[in-house]
Curated annotation (Swiss-Prot):
The keyword Nucleus applies. It comes from Mus musculus. GO terms for biological process: transcription by RNA polymerase III. The gene is Polr3gl. Disulfide bonds: none annotated. This is DNA-directed RNA polymerase III subunit RPC7-like. It is found in: Nucleus. Component of the RNA polymerase III (Pol III) complex consisting of 17 subunits. Pol III exists as two alternative complexes defined by the mutually exclusive incorporation of subunit POLR3G/RPC7alpha or POLR3GL/RPC7beta. Found in a trimeric complex with POLR3C/RPC3 and POLR3F/RPC6. Directly interacts with POLR3C. Residues 130-218 are annotated as: Disordered.
């Protein structure tokens, strides 16, 4: 019969690490807990390497700081949102919160860079002002009469031009009709001559044979 534990022992739990590696032997008591706070600045085991001294190191440091400042002034640098004040002032609109594109003194050789990265200068939009046109004085009666006379003269000229064109068209049509009639008369004369000269009714046929009519006909 199997035991109650199903073959599982109920011994003491084994440690997951070797105590001798920590420095505690078998049978030794554990050190008492420390109730004091840890030191604020514990001693450093590894000290940082000293900065390179000399002109070369100072030049590299200044160049790095200048590059950082230039990158922060570019329009592509994302700045944190500034919290708005509870009370807005009138002068807040005109204060420059950051550098404008025109104030950036950075002119690289754009031939070596893609065109998408080129800085586009913002143009200040001017406020549109409404232009008030002066009112034209009303036309007097003399001006109206002059315009009417001009229109009448233009109408007369147009009528004269149209009448001349109509007369020219009528003359051309009459000439064409006369030419057609002459052509028809000539054709008619030629047709009658042809009929008179070549028509044969057959009366003269067999005129010489009338003397022999007394003979018997078979």
């Amino acid at each position: 019969m199997a035991s109650r534990g199903g073959g599982r022992g109920r011994g003491r739990g084994q440690l997951t690490f070797n105590m001798e590696a920590v420095g505690i032997g078998k049978g030794d008591a554990l050190p008492p807990p420390t109730l004091q706070p840890s030191p604020l600045f514990p001693p450093l085991e590894f000290h940082p390497v000293p900065l390179p001294a000399g002109e070369e190191g100072e030049y590299v440091l200044a160049l790095k700081q200048e590059l950082r400042g230039a990158m922060r002034q570019l329009p592509y640098f994302i700045r944190p949102a500034v919290p708005k004040r509870d009370v807005e002032r009138y002068s807040d609109k005109y204060q420059m919160s950051g550098p404008i594109d025109n104030a950036i003194d950075w002119n690289p050789d754009w031939r070596r860079l893609p065109s998408e990265l080129k800085i586009r200068v913002r143009k200040v939009q001017k406020e549109r002002t409404t232009i008030i046109l002066p009112k034209r004085p009303p036309k007097s009666t003399d001006d109206k009469e002059e315009t009417i006379q001009k229109l009448e003269t233009l109408e007369k000229k147009e009528e004269e031009v149209t009448s001349e064109e109509d007369e020219e068209k009528e003359e051309e049509e009459e000439k064409e009709e006369g030419e057609e009639e002459e052509y028809d008369e000539e054709e008619h004369e030629e047709e009658t001559d042809y009929i008179m000269s070549y028509f044969d009714n057959g009366e003269d046929f067999g005129g010489d044979s009338d003397d022999n009519m007394d003979e018997a006909i078979y």
